[in-house]
C-alpha cells in the first residue's frame, strides 16, 4: 500500500471530530500559513468565508500536485503547442515531452504547500462572487463548498484562474447579451488594396491577401445609434501568433494574435472576440497588413446589446400574443404546416384563434423560444437555414434548441420590444405581403416594423422548463458564447495543465475540455464539476465531461459545442458502467469500506468523488457468489474489459459469501475480481447485465461446437465520428485527359462508411489512362487506400497524381499499402488523388478503404482467437489471414472471445457470436 494511502487512512481514522486540528497537524511547517487564513476570516462580517476556509483546510490533505523543473517544462510545452496549427499539436507535444525527465518532480500535498495569500484570495473571490449571484439561496452550503469554492479541480499546478478569467472575459459580468454569430461581410465586397485571390475554401471562393505594406481591407458599417459590436475574422494565416492591424474611424484598436492554419488554403475563425463601440452613422473598419501574411475571407459582426436580467419579464408561466407596432397584426403559428421549414406570418387578430396564442419557453440567459401554445406541438420560430443575411426569412421548424431558434426580448421603454435572434444578431421585422405580413430579419433601424408588443393571455397550465430566470443554469448560457474557443485534440497527458495555461491555450483532450468549462462556470459562481466514467463499458479508455450542478444536487451536462443541458445533439454508442462526480471533499464512505484492504486500485486512492450513475441511466444491483477460498475478503471489484485486461470500475461489500455491486450500467459485460499484489484476480464467469436489468452469465459450451467467421478484432466506433460521412458524394472516375475534362464517373459513394474495405465492380468497356477519387466539398478528400484492377485481375500501377495534401497525409499515402495512413487535402474543398497509367486500360473493379481504425482483418497478418476459460484467456487457434475474413472451426459455442492481431496493433475487444455475427461488448 502506498504511503499516500496510508496517510489518508490514518487521517480518516481520527478525522471524525477533529478534522481541522488534524489537518493543521499534517501541515507541518505550513501550519502557520493555514492558521493565518483562519485568523483572517475568523471575524469576517461574512461568516461564510470562515466556514469555507475550514472546509478547504479540512480537505486539503487529500489534494496534491507535482512540482519541479520538469513540471514547468511540461506546462511550457503545452503553451507552445497551443500556438501550433490544430492538426500538428498532438505530434508537437509528444515529440517535446518525450525528452523530459520527470525524476526531479516533487509530490506536493496541498496542506503542506499552499500559502496563506493564495488561499485567502481564492476564498474571497469565490465567496464574493457567490454573494453576487441571484441563485445563492437556492443551494445548500455543501454544494457551494464542493462545486464553486475549490481552488483546484484535479491535481493541476495552482494558479489565480479566477482573476485571469475576469480580465480575459469582462463581458461575462457585464449587463449585455451577445449574439452567437453575426452579419457576414465579404472582404472582396469591401474597399481593398490587397491581392484578390481565388480559393475554393473561402465562403464565396475569394479572399483578399494582406501580404505587403499598404495592403488593407476597409469596411463601411452604418448604425442608427451608438452601439457596441463584436468582431470576428474568417481568415487564413500560417505564421504563429499572426497580427493584423485594426483601425476604427482612424483610431487603432488592439486585437488578439491569430492562431495559425496548416496552410493558406485552410480558413479559421478568430477565437478571441474584438469588442468595438460604433458611433451613430457611418463607421470605417480597416484591417491592414502588420507584418504577417493573412488571407481575409470575411468579417463577422456580432451583436452586443445591453440587457439587465434583474429587470426581465418572465413570460414562461403564461400564454402570450405578439403583435407588430406598424401593422397591428399578430404572430400566427399554424399547427400543421404543409412543409417545413415554412415562412411565419402575421395576421389580423381573430378572437379565439389558438394559432395566435403563443408559448414562450425560457431557454437560458436572455433567450426565449416562441412556439404555438399546444404542448404536444414542437413547431417554433427560427431563422431559416441559420442564415445571417439581411432580409432573410424567419419561419417555422421543429424545435432543435439551436441558437437560430432563440430570441432575445430587448425593451424599448414604450411597452414594446426589439426581438433579436440569438444566432444572427439581427432583428425580427414585419414585411407586408398583401393581407398578411411575413417575417424577416434585418439590422435594427428603429422602424415600427421592428417593434413588438407582448401581451399575457392567461396561465400556461403545462409550463415545465429546466431553465428559470435568475438561475445558475440560465447564467451558463452566457458561457456558450465562448466555449467554442476551445479546440479539442487527442493528445496524451498524465498531468492536467495549469489552469492559467489552459485558459490561455484553450486546447486539449476531454479532461482539459471539461476543466476549461468548469473553471468558466465557477468564475461566475455557477456550481459545476467534472463527471467521469473510469472506463467505457464497450470500448477502451475512460472519459470526462463538464456538468452544471443544480440546486437539488443533481446535475445536467454542459457538453462543449452544446448549450447547457442540451443532450440531444451529443450522441454516441459508448456505454458507461459507472459515472462518478468529482468533488473537493473526500468520500469517507468509500474510504471506510476499503479501510481493511491491504491495497486498493489506483481509482480508489483517496476517492474524492461520488456515484451518480443513477442520474444517467436505469441501473442494476448485481449479486455474485464469492468463492469459499476468499471467505476472509471484505470487498471485491467489478471490472470491464480493456484491450487486454479486466479493469476495476467499482467495488462491492462482501456479506455472507456474496458480493453486491450497486447501480451498475446495463448492456455491458462484467467480471468480478479481487485485487491482490497490484493485480486483478478474476473469479467466476463473465456476466452480462442486459437492457432490462436481468443478469446473464456467459458460459461456454465445450460440447456444442460452432464455426466463427470474423471480420474485425475491435468494433468500428467511427460510425458516430465526423469523418464517417466525408466520402458521401465522392466520385471514382477515369479519363484520358490530364485535367479530367472528359471524366467518366464509375461510381459515386453515398452514405456513411464502415471502416472496412469496399470492392466495387466497374461495368465500363472504355479504356482510361487517368484514374482518380475526387472528394465531396468539405471532406478534405479523405481516403486511406485505393486500388484499381485491370481485366486480367491484376492491380494497376502508375504515377501518383492529385492535389496537395497535408505534410502528414500526402497523396502518396493512398498507395502505400498501409490502411492507417491516408490523404487529407490542405483545405476542405477541391481535392482529388489518383494514378496516371503508362497506357490506357479497361478497369474491371476497384477497391478502397476509407478513414478507419485499422482493426479490420488484414491479409497477411497473423491472428489468434482466445476465449475465457477457467479464469483466464485460453488459445483456440492461430491463423494468417488469406482474405479479409477469418474462419475458425470447431470452436466451443456460447463463450466470450477475443481476436488478437499478433502482427501489429493493440486494440482488442470481447465479443460473443450470435446468429452468425460478432456481437461486441
Segments from the language model and where they lie:
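Secondary-structure boundary elements
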Residues: 49-182, 457-505, 541
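Extracellular carbohydrate recognition and processing domains
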Residues: 251-281, 743-762, 877-889
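Short beta-strand-plus-loop segments that form exposed binding edges in beta-rich domains
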Residues: 286-294, 773-779, 900-906
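Lectin-like carbohydrate-binding module/patch detector with strong preference for beta-trefoil
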Residues: 307-460
Amino acid at each position: 500500500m502506498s504511503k499516500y494511502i496510508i496517510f489518508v487512512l490514518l487521517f480518516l481514522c481520527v478525522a471524525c471530530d477533529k478534522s481541522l486540528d488534524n489537518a493543521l497537524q499534517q501541515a507541518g511547517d505550513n501550519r502557520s500559513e493555514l492558521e493565518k487564513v483562519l485568523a483572517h476570516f475568523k471575524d469576517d462580517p461574512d461568516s461564510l468565508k470562515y466556514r469555507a476556509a475550514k472546509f478547504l483546510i479540512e480537505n486539503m490533505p487529500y489534494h496534491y500536485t507535482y512540482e519541479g523543473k520538469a513540471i514547468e517544462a511540461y506546462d511550457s510545452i503545452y503553451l507552445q503547442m497551443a500556438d501550433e496549427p490544430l492538426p500538428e499539436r498532438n505530434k508537437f507535444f509528444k515529440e517535446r515531452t518525450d525528452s523530459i525527465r520527470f525524476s526531479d518532480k516533487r509530490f506536493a500535498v496541498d496542506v503542506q504547500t499552499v500559502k496563506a495569500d493564495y488561499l485567502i484570495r481564492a476564498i474571497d473571490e469565490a465567496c464574493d462572487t457567490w454573494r453576487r449571484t441571484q441563485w445563492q439561496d437556492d443551494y445548500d452550503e455543501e454544494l457551494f463548498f464542493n462545486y464553486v469554492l475549490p481552488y483546484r479541480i484535479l491535481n493541476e499546478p495552482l494558479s489565480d484562474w479566477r482573476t485571469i478569467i475576469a480580465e480575459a472575459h469582462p463581458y461575462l459580468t457585464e449587463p449585455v447579451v451577445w449574439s452567437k454569430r453575426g452579419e457576414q461581410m465579404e472582404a472582396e465586397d469591401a474597399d481593398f488594396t490587397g491581392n484578390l485571390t481565388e480559393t475554393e475554401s473561402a465562403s464565396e471562393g475569394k479572399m483578399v491577401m494582406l501580404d505587403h505594406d499598404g495592403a488593407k481591407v476597409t469596411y463601411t458599417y452604418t448604425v442608427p445609434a451608438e452601439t457596441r459590436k463584436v468582431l470576428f475574422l474568417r481568415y487564413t494565416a500560417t505564421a504563429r501568433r499572426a497580427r493584423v492591424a485594426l483601425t476604427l474611424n482612424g483610431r487603432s484598436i488592439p486585437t488578439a494574435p491569430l492562431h495559425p492554419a496548416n496552410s493558406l488554403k485552410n480558413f479559421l475563425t478568430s477565437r478571441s472576440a474584438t469588442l468595438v463601440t460604433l458611433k451613430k452613422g457611418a463607421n470605417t473598419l480597416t484591417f491592414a497588413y502588420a507584418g504577417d501574411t493573412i488571407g481575409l475571407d470575411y468579417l463577422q459582426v456580432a451583436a452586443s446589446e445591453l440587457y439587465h436580467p434583474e429587470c426581465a419579464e418572465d413570460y414562461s408561466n403564461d400564454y402570450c400574443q405578439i403583435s407588430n407596432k406598424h401593422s397591428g397584426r399578430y404572430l400566427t403559428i399554424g399547427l400543421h404546416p404543409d412543409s417545413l421549414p415554412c415562412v411565419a406570418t402575421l395576421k389580423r387578430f381573430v378572437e379565439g384563434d389558438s394559432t395566435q396564442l403563443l408559448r414562450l419557453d425560457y431557454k437560458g440567459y436572455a433567450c426565449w423560444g416562441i412556439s404555438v401554445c399546444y404542448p404536444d406541438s414542437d413547431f417554433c420560430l427560427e431563422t431559416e437555414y441559420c442564415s445571417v443575411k439581411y432580409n432573410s426569412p424567419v419561419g417555422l421548424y421543429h424545435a432543435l434548441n439551436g441558437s437560430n431558434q432563440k430570441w432575445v426580448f430587448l425593451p424599448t421603454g414604450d411597452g414594446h420590444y426589439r426581438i433579436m435572434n440569438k444566432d444572427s444578431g439581427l432583428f425580427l421585422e414585419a414585411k407586408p405581403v398583401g393581407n398578411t405580413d411575413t417575417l424577416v430579419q434585418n439590422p435594427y433601424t428603429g422602424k415600427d416594423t421592428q417593434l413588438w408588443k407582448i401581451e399575457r393571455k392567461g396561465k400556461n397550465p403545462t409550463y415545465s422548463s429546466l431553465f428559470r430566470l435568475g438561475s445558475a443554469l440560465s447564467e451558463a448560457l452566457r458561457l456558450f458564447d465562448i466555449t467554442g474557443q476551445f479546440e479539442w485534440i487527442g493528445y496524451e497527458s498524465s498531468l492536467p495543465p495549469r489552469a492559467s495555461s489552459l485558459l490561455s491555450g484553450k486546447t486539449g483532450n476531454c479532461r482539459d475540455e471539461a476543466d476549461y468549462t468548469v473553471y468558466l462556470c465557477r468564475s461566475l459562481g455557477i456550481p459545476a464539476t467534472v463527471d467521469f466514467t473510469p472506463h467505457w463499458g464497450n470500448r477502451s479508455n475512460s472519459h470526462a465531461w463538464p456538468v452544471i450542478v443544480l440546486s437539488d444536487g443533481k446535475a445536467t451536462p454542459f457538453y462543449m459545442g452544446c448549450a447547457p443541458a442540451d443532450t440531444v445533439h451529443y450522441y454516441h454508442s459508448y456505454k458507461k458502467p459507472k459515472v462518478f462526480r468529482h468533488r473537493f471533499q473526500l468520500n469517507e464512505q468509500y474510504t471506510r469500506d476499503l479501510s481493511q484492504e491491504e491495497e486498493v486500485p489506483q481509482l480508489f486512492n483517496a476517492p474524492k468523488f461520488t456515484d451518480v450513475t443513477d442520474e444517467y441511466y436505469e441501473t442494476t444491483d448485481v449479486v455474485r457468489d464469492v468463492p469459499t477460498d476468499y471467505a476472509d475478503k471484505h470487498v471485491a471489484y467489478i471490472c470491464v474489459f480493456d484491450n487486454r485486461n479486466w479493469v476495476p470500475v467499482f467495488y462491492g461489500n462482501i456479506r455472507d459469501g456474496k458480493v453486491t455491486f450497486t447501480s451498475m450500467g446495463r448492456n455491458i459485460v462484467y467480471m468480478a475480481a479481487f485485487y491482490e499484489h497490484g493485480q486483478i484476480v478474476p473469479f467466476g464467469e463473465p456476466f452480462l447485465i442486459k437492457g432490462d436489468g436481468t443478469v446473464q452469465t456467459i458460459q461456454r459450451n465445450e460440447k456444442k461446437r460452432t464455426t466463427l467467421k470474423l471480420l474485425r478484432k475491435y468494433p468500428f466506433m467511427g460510425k458516430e465520428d465526423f469523418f464517417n460521412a466525408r466520402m458521401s458524394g465522392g466520385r471514382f472516375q477515369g479519363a484520358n485527359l490530364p485535367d479530367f475534362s472528359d471524366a467518366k464517373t464509375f461510381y459515386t459513394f453515398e452514405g456513411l462508411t464502415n471502416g472496412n474495405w469496399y470492392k466495387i465492380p466497374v461495368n465500363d468497356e472504355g479504356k482510361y489512362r487517368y484514374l482518380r477519387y475526387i472528394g465531396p466539398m468539405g471532406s478534405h478528400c479523405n481516403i486511406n487506400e485505393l486500388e484499381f484492377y485491370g481485366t486480367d485481375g491484376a492491380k494497376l500501377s502508375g504515377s501518383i497524381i492529385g492535389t496537395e495534401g497535408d505534410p502528414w497525409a500526402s497523396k502518396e499515402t493512398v498507395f502505400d499499402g498501409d490502411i492507417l495512413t491516408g490523404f487529407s487535402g490542405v483545405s476542405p474543398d477541391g481535392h482529388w488523388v489518383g494514378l496516371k497509367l503508362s497506357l490506357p486500360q479497361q478497369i474491371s473493379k476497384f477497391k478502397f478503404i476509407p478513414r478507419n481504425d485499422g482493426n479490420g482483418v488484414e491479409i497477411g497478418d497473423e491472428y489468434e482467437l482466445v476465449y475465457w476459460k477457467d479464469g483466464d484467456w485460453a488459445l483456440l487457434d492461430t491463423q494468417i489471414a488469406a482474405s479479409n475474413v477469418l474462419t475458425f472451426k470447431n470452436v466451443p459455442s456460447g463463450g466470450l472471445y477475443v481476436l488478437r492481431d499478433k502482427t501489429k496493433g493493440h486494440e482488442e475487444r470481447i465479443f460473443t457470436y450470435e446468429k452468425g455475427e460478432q456481437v461486441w461488448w
